Every structure is written in C-alpha cells, then in structure tokens.
Amino acid sequence: MCIRDRVRCLTRLIEPTSGSVIIDDTDITKISRNSLLDLRRNKMSMVFQHFGLFPHRTVLENISYGLEIRGEKKQERLDKATESLNLVGLKGWHNNYPRELSGGMQQRVGLARAMAVEPEILIFDEPFSALDPLIRREMQDELLDIQKKLQRTMVFITHDFLEAIKMGDHIAIMKDGEISQVGTPEEIVANPVDKYVKDFCEDVPKYKVLSAGKVMRKECSD
C-alpha cells in the first residue's frame, strides 16, 4: 500500500478492507455517502506534496477555492482567504499567480487554502518533500507555530523519520500497509518493538528525543 492509498483510506476515497477510522467517536467506514461528503467538505482538508494550485487563479482565488465550492458568499470567502494568507506570511501576494512564486511560497498557498475552510482535521501528504532543506525546515517550524495558534488535529505523512519526530506528538510507523508501532517519539526511540522500527531509529540523535529519565539507570541500594 502506497502513501496515497493510506490517505485515501482515511478519507474513504478507497474503502478500507478491514479496521475502523474513528472521528469524534464515529466510525466513518459505516456512515452514509452523504454524511461522508459532508465530513470531507466541512471537517477535513488536505495539503499535497506538489501543491495542487490552479495556475489560472491568483493566490487569493486559489486559497478561497474550497470556500467557493462550499457555497460561501464572495466577501466572506475573500475575508477568510485573506486571513489565511496573512497567517502563512504571504501578505501582499494576493494578486500574484502561482508561477510567480517560489516552491516554498507555493506550499504556503497550499497550506493557506487548506486552513481557509477551517477544518477540524488537516491531512498532510508529504507536503515538504519537494522543497530544499532550508525551506523545508522553515516550513516545518512555521507549521508548528500555526498548530500552536489553531490547535487543529493534523495527520502528517512522511517517509522521513526525523521529520516525523520533529512534527509529531504521536507517530505510527507502517510496514506493508500495517502499523508496526504507535507511540510518542520518545517511546518509539527508547523501545522499538522490532528490528524494522529499530532500523528507523538507528540514525536518530537520541539526545534530541530522550529525556534524562529514560536513559538513567536506577542506582541499586545495598
């Protein structure tokens, strides 16, 4: 199962063959088609690896697209789009087109578009993998700052374990379409359940992840 298949399972664009997807105590694998469409439209939003921007639309028009599809009035959607634009640090770029932006700026537009619809859940499909390392770190830090402000549930999919440790408070490591281990970064690095997970953790600077209590040994009393 590739990453995009996992994303599609979360949103039921591909029907899971087994298991459950629980959102707000509801198993969405069992809800009606209309309820599912409402969930996707109003509670979920996605940020793609390759931005997915419309080249013929301005930055502000790209950001407001989801609101347009939802049927919101023009002024309302422009106000929300402008707020999202400012949040990602692109104030003043509203009338530019995607071709006039750098890769990092385009990804900011993609992020702003996802946030403009005010979703409860943001799904990130390897959003920064196409960026150079410096811009990638900037975007990671910016997203963490935005998360502190918005307090949204974020599902961040990546092949980079160091990125997962930086971005996630809980991590699920998958192999062949199945979850190998779920835990905090500290739990996974300190106690990998098998060789596959241990190999993931091999090059991790453990001092960045583990607390002193995890590595200290209790002194034996005589």
Residue ranges and their predicted role:
Residues 182-183, 191:
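ABC ATPase "signature
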Residues 26-27, 64, 68, 75-93, ...:
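Conserved ABC ATPase "signature" region
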Residues 11:
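Helix-to-loop junction immediately C-terminal to a conserved catalytic motif
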Residues 116-120:
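A short, proline-enriched helix->beta-strand linker immediately N-terminal to the Walker B motif
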Residues 28-45, 69, 75, 192:
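ABC ATPase NBD coupling module
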Residues 97-101, 105:
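Conserved ABC ATPase signature
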